[in-house]
Amino acid sequence: MGKIIGIDLGTTNSCVAIMDGTTARVLENAEGDRTTPSIIAYTQDGETLVGQPAKRQAVTNPQNTLFAIKRLIGRRFQDEEVQRDVSIMPYKIVAADNGDAWLDVKGTKTAPPQISAEVLKKMKKTAEDYLGEPVTEAVITVPAYFNDAQRQATKDAGRIAGLEVKRIINEPTAAALAYGLDKEVGNRTIAVYDLGGGTFDISIIEIDEVDGEKTFEVLATNGDTHLGGEDFDTRLINYLVDEFKKDQGIDLRNDPLAMQRLKEAAEKAKIELSSAQQTDVNLPYITADATGPKHMNIKVTRAKLESLVEDLVNRSIEPLKVALQDAGLSVSDINDVILVGGQTRMPMVQKKVAEFFGKEPRKDVNPDEAVAIGAAVQGGVLTGDVKDVLLLDVTPLSLGIETMGGVMTALINKNTTIPTKHSQVFSTAEDNQSAVTIHVLQGERKRASDNKSLGQFNLDGINPAPRGMPQIEVTFDIDADGILHVSAKDKNSGKEQKITIKASSGLNEEEIQKMVREAEANAESDRKFEELVQTRNQGDHLLHSTRKQVEEAGDKLPADDKTAIESALTALETSLKGEDKADIEAKMQALAQASQKLMEIAQQQHAQQQAGSADAQASNAKDDDVVDAEFEEVKDKK
């Protein structure tokens, strides 16, 4: 069985790890970094860039450089959170035919899982380069508070990337695995506070050790899937834009290029203010008007940044209270607090968390790598490489169906350990009713319409009977990935209907297969592009070296040969501007044929140089034929 890799598919950065024996190892990507920016760019010449290369060109290509895609995965276009992003993102968010939030990439509607798959492909390639063998299986992490649609969309992204997703696990749970596996912690209750680039989670986890086996049991989880570092950046960007408008009278929001530069500068300033008390945002030539170019130079203090984001930090505190309450614990029952996610490096966040729990968070967990390490550990558990570890996760939100009067009736309550199965018997609302619609919901509200609709299906063929008489058994079954399977059975007729909830906003099987095929086709075109570039480089090198040799040969090269070589050089130069690898190779071959006489002259010149060098060394040796004398230094006596 091959390796199951662990992937932290983050909003801002992603990370991949593997089990190396009994130790998890975070892998460096092609650029030599342990984390990869979750940024995808589509260039004018049809190339797809992922990670640092995509980030570097964002300023000149803002509309086709996509970031924070995780905030859109599994979401409807009309969702309030999506509408907030529509107005501030430099790229175009559009409504798909099924009402999903998709993206407009160079005029083509593209699904978020398809774009996230590009990041997963890079993670897969990083692991394959390290292992020297193909990788086909992965454990991928998601925020604990992701709903069913978001989990399913993440699995779809994995499939499009050519990965069989063996397990979806919650990010805080993965961080707890990374923290607890190699420590002799005994029985402990830990709080994992995970504030990443786009999402926030809190999980209360109990680590029990019995006879050498460690059980990681999630007692409760809560969070906000639209709160993270990107929101902190946006606050700072808005402040800088407003200050510039006050000073110069120009609103930079209408200038995508300026906004992209500002986004980079704001992110950098935010990071600097975690260690410094103040920083300068200095952007020369940020824009121009009739009077000439304009420059931005604004001083930002840590206190100013904290005042801009204080309500965001406070927003993360309420879920902490709810999670503790759901777990039936008080603050004093928590032994350790673990911080995960890059945004937790902000001193204000650390201070607020310390104040709430009454203890300093632990500093021995890498907030950027812990989640990927935990995913790799779970991969090791699935392959049998990691033994004596049992992971008991929970479903983050209640699951149920709509019943008479538009009420949601929960079949599985939030924070129930998964996998789990629960059945309940319902009946008809009308006399002689022959069919019922099962409307599946996820959420905590009593009114059905206030919860997230996960989909619906019909159970037909119910025998005519007075209302309330038929017995319809509805069963909810949640697998270890937190994905829901629902069935409804008429106990009288034995008729049954089943569905795996794909959510009304999910991709159907046909769409996923099409995207998988496109990804495979792209992999082939990427390979061909790489081969073309290598051939071009060889051609460039041949051009340069041949021209140099023609120059060095001078009059020794016959005129006919020189003309033939010049003609072959021109032909190769023209071919290098094209896209035909075979033609470039043919022109290189033709140049080599035409250059045979030149090669002979070059070899003769080289031989003469070697002979001349040998003569010079012999002559120097004669000059050096002198006698060394020993001498003794005698110091004068004073």
UniProtKB/Swiss-Prot annotation:
The keyword Amino-acid biosynthesis does not apply. InterPro entries: ATPase_NBD, Chaperone_DnaK, Heat_shock_70_CS, HSP70_C_sf, HSP70_peptide-bd_sf, Hsp_70_fam. Keywords: ATP-binding, Chaperone, Nucleotide-binding, Phosphoprotein, Stress response. One of its GO terms (molecular function) is unfolded protein binding. The keyword Transport does not apply. Gene3D superfamilies: 1.20.1270.10, 3.30.420.40, Actin, Chain A, domain 4, Substrate Binding Domain Of DNAk, Chain A, domain 1. Residues 599-638 are annotated as: Disordered. HAMAP family: DnaK. This is Chaperone protein DnaK. The lineage of its organism: Bacteria, Pseudomonadati, Pseudomonadota, Gammaproteobacteria, Enterobacterales. The gene is dnaK.
